[in-house]
Amino acid sequence: MAFKEVVRVAVTGGKGQIAYNFLFALAHGDVFGVDRGVDLRIYDVPGTERALSGVRMELDDGAYPLLHRLRVTTSLNDAFDGIDAAFLIGAVPRGPGMERGDLLKQNGQIFSLQGAALNTAAKRDAKIFVVGNPVNTNCWIAMKHAPRLHRKNFHAMLRLDQNRMHSMLAHRAEVPLEEVSRVVIWGNHSAKQVPDFTQARISGKPAAEVIGDRDWLENILVHSVQNRGSAVIEARGKSSAASASRALAEAARSIFCPKSDEWFSSGVCSDHNPYGIPEDLIFGFPCRMLPSGDYEIIPGLPWEPFIRNKIQISLDEIAQEKASVSSL
């Protein structure tokens, strides 16, 4: 099969559930399109070789035409060698009784090593998508340990939050999903994220005007989006996997296969942002792709006092997380 190009891709956490779902979407063309081949490297920590071999067998058995090359590895340098894109999914999950600070430090060590390996082995313009939580801070740690790579190309995944809000607005307004646009998530991927309904449009009109229920928007919608991950865990006993995988595929596709004037939310480096957010943070902003192939943070969006206050709370949390891992 003739490809427009072959994309070298690394996926970490290869034996986990999010990666398991994501890998088949990747091989099917849901991430880079159906005209790009994929040179895929699947990584997980030493001791997972048998599980990785099973994942490889299933991908082989799928007979995916776009899967140009496939290998599994427990070496970060091998996984990241010459890559165009990395999806950093693997992370330590938060266990019973674990403090958030402990989680930050444990994952900080993981993403320090991954960032250093990216710095050594990846292409300088490689695009890095971080999924493992706490995702904003993990992304910042990886970025700081990979100074050779462009800071603008590090993304912390907020697309699942965006999708959750998108779906909730469509259900409330009783309209198809395609009628909802300009769904924006600011700040941290946590219970202090800021789902900004004031920017959203339903059938081209302001969502607040169409919904007509400010109390529902401020209290029910915002709270539901902020806490959806916990609600999923409580309901099914496991964290989101299939929906997270789909969100990751869409997040990458928005960058590699952009649609005209599509808005997407991503945690990106705050350097030179148009909203006065301090620099050297990974902060959620609304973005869109430019003809040059770069993205821009969409400028000039007004913040109502309700949204501004919540953005400050989310910003404070990100700054505190950064301070707690700066020694790494």
Swiss-Prot record:
Q: Which InterPro entries match?
A: L-lactate/malate_DH, Lactate/malate_DH_C, Lactate/malate_DH_N, Lactate_DH/Glyco_Ohase_4_C, Malate_DH_type2, NAD(P)-bd_dom_sf
The name this protein carries in UniProt is Malate dehydrogenase
UniProt xrefs under HAMAP family: Malate_dehydrog_2
- Residue positions of the active site: H189
Q: Where does NAD(+) bind?
A: G13, G14, K15, G16, Q17, I18, A19, N107, Q114, V131, G132, N133
Which PANTHER family does the protein's record reference?
MALATE DEHYDROGENASE
Annotated NCBIfam families: MalateDH-SF1, PRK05442.1
Query: What does the record give as the reaction this protein catalyses?
Result: (S)-malate + NAD(+) = oxaloacetate + NADH + H(+)
Return the EC number.
1.1.1.37
Enzyme class, one word?
Answer: oxidoreductase
Q: Name one GO biological process term.
A: tricarboxylic acid cycle
Which terms in the Gene Ontology molecular function aspect does this entry carry?
L-malate dehydrogenase (NAD+) activity
Q: Per its UniProt record, what Pfam families does this chain match?
A: Ldh_1_C (PF02866), Ldh_1_N (PF00056)
Physiological role:
Catalyzes the reversible oxidation of malate to oxaloacetate.
Q: Which family does it belong to?
A: Belongs to the LDH/MDH superfamily. MDH type 2 family.
Keyword line: NAD, Oxidoreductase, Tricarboxylic acid cycle
Q: Which residues bind substrate?
A: R94, R100, N133, R164
Give disulfide pairs as residue numbers: none
